[in-house]
């Protein structure tokens, strides 16, 4: 069993660097940034490019996440995403990393973010 306090973690800046470094790669080789906050939180502010998979539906929908891609998990502060990181690692995913400090740290670092209503397809796991 994985302890949520001891899951692999990176800073928001490092997570963004990983995403940017893979920017030109085929979609199936790029890391996916998964936000586990609830929709009302996600619509207010989100890391640019994040896909939404709310914690409230995570147990039912986690199987939608690819097991052959790097996954970066994010939430508001890093607590919920640490729990989901631990869950995925305990259930067969091998390349899952928590974004320490979550969206709060992302914004404090001045990293790309979106605010307000979603564009069509924005936040979809398949986008």
Label each region the model flagged.
Residues 1-32, 39-70, 79-127:
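Rhodanese-like catalytic fold shared by cysteine-dependent sulfurtransferases
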Residues 74:
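Short, surface-exposed ligand- or partner-binding patches at beta-edge/loop junctions that are enriched
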């Amino acid at each position: 069993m994985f302890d949520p306090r001891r899951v692999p973690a990176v800073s928001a800046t490092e997570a963004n660097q990983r995403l940017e470094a893979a920017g030109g790669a085929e979609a199936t080789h790029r890391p996916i940034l998964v936000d586990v906050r609830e929709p009302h939180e996600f619509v207010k502010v989100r890391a640019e490019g994040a896909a939404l998979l709310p914690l409230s539906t995570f147990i039912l929908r986690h199987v939608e996440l690819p097991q052959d891609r790097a996954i970066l998990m994010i939430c508001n502060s890093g607590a919920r995403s640490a729990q989901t990181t631990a869950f995925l690692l305990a259930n067969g995913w091998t390349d899952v990393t928590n974004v320490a400090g979550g969206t709060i740290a992302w914004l404090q670092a001045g990293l790309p973010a979106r605010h307000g209503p979603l564009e069509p397809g924005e936040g979809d796991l398949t986008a």
